[in-house]
Amino acid sequence: SKCDAAGPTHTRIGDDKSGIHGGAYYIPDDKYNEFMELYHRDVISKNKLEYLTEKQIMTDSSPIAVDLDLHFALDIENRVYSQEHIDDLVDIYLAELSEMFQFSESTAFPVFIFEKEKINRVPDKNMTKDGLHMIIGIQMGHDAQCILRNRVKDKVAECWGDFPLTNSW
């Protein structure tokens, strides 16, 4: 549905070439799971182009959200990163978090990795797109998340530096 008084939860970036119109939308909590199932069915599983972004909640704190968008030349036909790269990414974040927080030996929290089933070749834009999302189950304010991102950015770029990226970190 269109935005209500709570403001948009999602925005859609328009792309005239693809016939995708921009907009802002409000998905209520009680419809979110249904929305995600429909989105997966109609967009992700059919590998359709879509430019929908979820607005990050700007409360005092929220789980740590990491979004890695990887762009390559169109001739890249297979996923470039491996499970080892993902493990290194998680290790880099955990090392930085241990510098920012005091954890006891028994501290445990979830780390979720989300990735598409396959890369997305976009001939119209002469590129191949890939990427992943990571959610770390620690509550952290938005400003602190920005600090964390700045602290890990160069380390991730160094670790994944052999990738033939066409975009920057």
Language-model-detected regions and their locations in the chain:
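Structured partner-binding subdomains within large eukaryotic complex subunits
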Residues: L165-W169
